[in-house]
From Swiss-Prot:
Disulfide bonds: none annotated. The gene is caiT. Its main location: membrane. The chain crosses the membrane at residues 10-30, 51-71, 92-112, 143-163, 195-215, 231-251, 263-283, 316-336, 347-367, 398-418, 446-466, 475-495. It comes from Shigella dysenteriae serotype 1 (strain Sd197). This is L-carnitine/gamma-butyrobetaine antiporter. One of its GO terms (biological process) is carnitine metabolic process.
Length: 504
């Protein structure tokens, strides 16, 4: 009976400060767009050039941590006493779909163009060497290295959630073993949680800022509807409504509905591109790129380009590592929630092997298709970007395929539904982090989850009003800085507590 009377409403100290901070930042940005752009460029340059090395070392250390979990003393430990909540197939699909939105399709279709037009290591733009290295860098940025980071933190949160029976899931609640209960539940812990939530809100906004133009450009191609900010707002509203429907079904039913559809559809679409684009070339290009990745891996891991100062590692590697860092806690909480009953080794291998295969397939197929279209002069990406923007260039890479109308319909549906999954995962984590007394196996209040979806949608609209990729990239970079330290503290806290309380 006591459990029925527990208050599970929002926690004011971690609910209102992020909203106020985000509101002030958005107001200052919209108030003077020119001044905001100056600040945005300065912040991006400072963080990537001065602190880029720290992000690179973070990823390397976390990779070694993954090996320690897989082959160390906790490998066979089970995350909870219950059997797995989801089947292995649904489990993998939920993980893949939660990390695959239209924002990922955005980069998968266009990323290789930037790599070959502004290549690393002093290579000539659009040269043979640049093209040989283009896909290899995509496999590097979206391969085992970042997934190992996610799996380590997922194990940490699953341990605190299901083994230690933690009642509240937010970063500060995991820091008790490291800083003590007084500081974890006091001002220090509140500051940590607010940094996390502010960064996460902007991260979700950036994903919507990348996803929405793809959908609206699809609508312009299919229906002739002009791409406007008002149309962007309508699309975001539709995502919020669909998310509310999934939430109303509960995590298990809603999660499966939201994840299975884009997962199956994405593999169907990728299979179509693979067949009609050139299966032989794609397999040869992938095989060669794996070899290039292995050859250049040490340089890629530690590439900061301090002498030539070409800007490639700052603009791409550091940006992507900040992207992974800023989403690490949010996604790890969600992935931990659906991994109850799994062993540590099973969770680590499931994420790194399964999700690496998924992202490598996506980037290989889409990147190879874009490269073929460029080499055959079927589309002029620089001209499309200059005249219409990046989203239009991406749409044209899909429209150039056979049966273009059917292909565009498939891409439109995939982008739309996949982003619903992202919003669902993020709203769930935000609600869990801003509510009190939510225990393992329970769901946060419905209205709180829907409320966060609405608020994040507003942030996405504001970022779209700013225009361009630089504000989106800067939001990720700036948000990744405080979470860089938060992630490290969560990791150290897990290691310390596990050594004391997770013995045979």
């Amino acid at each position: 009976m006591k459990n029925e009377k527990r208050k599970t409403g929002m926690e004011p100290k971690v609910f209102f400060p992020p909203l106020i901070i985000v509101g002030i930042l958005c107001w200052l940005t919209v108030r003077d767009l020119d001044a905001a752009n100056v600040v945005i460029n300065a912040v991006f340059s400072y963080v990537t050039n001065v602190w880029g090395w720290a992000f690179e070392w973070y990823m390397v250390v976390m990779l070694f941590g993954w090996f320690w979990l897989v082959f160390g003393p906790y490998a066979k430990k089970r995350l909870g006493n219950e059997p797995p909540e989801f089947s292995t197939a649904s489990w993998i699909f939920m993980m893949f779909a939660s990390c695959t939105s239209a924002a990922v399709l955005f980069w998968g279709s266009i990323e290789i163009y930037y790599y070959i037009s502004t290549p690393p290591f002093g290579l000539e733009p659009n040269s043979t060497g640049a093209k040989e290295l283009g896909l290899a860098y995509s496999l590097f940025h979206w391969g085992p290295l970042p997934w190992a980071t996610y799996s380590f933190l997922s194990v940490a949160f699953a341990y605190f959630f299901f083994v230690r029976k933690m009642e509240v899931i937010r970063p500060s609640s995991t820091l008790v073993p490291l800083v003590g209960e007084k500081h974890a539940k006091g001002l220090f812990g509140t500051i940590v949680d607010n940094f996390y939530l502010v960064a996460l809100i902007f991260a979700m906004g950036t994903s919507l800022g990348l996803a929405t133009p793809l959908v609206t450009e699809c609508m312009q191609w299919l229906f002739g509807i002009p791409h406007t900010l008002q149309l962007d707002a309508i699309i975001i509203t539709c995502w919020i409504i669909l998310n509310a429907i999934c939430v109303a079904c509960g995590l298990q039913k809603g999660g499966r509905i939201a994840s299975d559809v884009p997962s199956y559809l994405s593999f169907l679409m990728l299979g179509w591109v693979f067949i009609v684009s050139g299966a032989s070339f794609i397999m040869n290009y992938f095989t060669d790129s794996v070899g290039m990745l292995l050859m250049y891996l040490p340089r890629m891991l530690f590439y900061t380009d301090p002498i030539a100062k070409g800007g490639f590692p700052q603009g791409w590697s550091v940006f992507y590592w900040a992207w992974w860092v800023i989403y690490a806690i949010q996604m790890s909480i969600f992935l931990a929630r659906i991994s109850r009953g799994r062993t540590v080794r099973e969770l680590c291998f499931g994420m790194v092997l399964g999700l690496t295969a998924s992202t490598w397939i996506l980037w290989t197929v889409l990147g190879s298709n874009t490269l073929l279209l460029i080499d055959k002069n079927i589309i002029n990406i620089p001209n499309l970007i200059e005249q219409y923007g990046v989203a239009r260039a991406i749409i044209e890479t899909w429209a150039a395929l056979p049966l273009s109308t059917a292909t565009m319909w498939g891409f439109f549906i995939l982008c739309f539904i996949a982003t619903v999954t992202l919003v669902n995962a993020c709203s769930y984590t935000l609600a869990m982090s801003t509510c009190r007394e939510v225990r393992g196996g329970e769901e946060p209040p419905l209205l709180v989850r829907i409320g966060w979806s609405i608020l994040v949608g507003i942030i996405g609209i504001v970022l779209l009003a700013l225009g361009g990729l630089k504000p989106i990239q800067t939001a990720i970079i700036a948000g990744g800085c405080p979470l860089f330290f938060v992630n490290i503290m969560v990791t150290l806290s897990f290691i310390k507590d596990a050594k004391q309380n997770w013995k045979d």
